[in-house]
Amino acid sequence: MINDIKKDAQERMGKSIEALSRNLAAIRTGRAHPSILDSVKVTAWGSEMPLNQVAAITVEDARTLKIVAHDKNLSAAIEKAILTSDLGLNPSSAGTTIRVPMPALTEETRKGYTKQASGVAEDAKVAVRNVRRDALADLKKLTKDKEISEDEERRAADEIQKLTDKFVAEVDAAFKAKEKDLMAV
């Protein structure tokens, strides 16, 4: 039972870290990276589809992404989707190829993105701590129902705290890496 609680907590904390990674990847830096466009949805064939399912996205150079639509009729829809996304990008189209230059980030923009990354990291920490709270509540319930002793509960709670500390440290490390990436000129 205790192992199930710990395993569940570890899986849920891991999912929080995965979500953090996705959210941090969506915050753009000055460099071109295909994951910047992960949040872009294109209206294609009557439904909203992720951009990476309707086009090939490659890095042309350090500041330019190249997008080649799988279907040439989608080029205009892809360009519109990128323009209407809140990424602040201006694609230029040449036939079936769309180039997306990454504008240089100003100091003010960098600070804004760093603040956004900080908020995302804080949300991830809160999610990890909520998982800890749930796991500790489950342990308390087992102790109350006399399924485990108080000593076992205390030991398991210590292990869950260590797990929480480990995942919070991972969140901090991911944020520091993103902050360093954002502040690099």
Swiss-Prot record:
One of the GO BP terms on file: cytoplasmic translational termination
Gene Ontology molecular function: ribosomal large subunit binding
Entry GO terms, CC: cytosol
Signal peptide: none
Keywords assigned by UniProt, alphabetized: Cytoplasm, Protein biosynthesis
Annotated localization: Cytoplasm
Domain of life the protein comes from: Bacteria
Family according to the record: Belongs to the RRF family.
Its biological purpose: Responsible for the release of ribosomes from messenger RNA at the termination of protein biosynthesis. May increase the efficiency of translation by recycling ribosomes from one round of translation to another.
Alphabetized HAMAP family for the sequence: RRF
Protein name stated in the entry: Ribosome-recycling factor
Organism for this UniProt entry: Pseudomonas putida (strain ATCC 47054 / DSM 6125 / CFBP 8728 / NCIMB 11950 / KT2440)
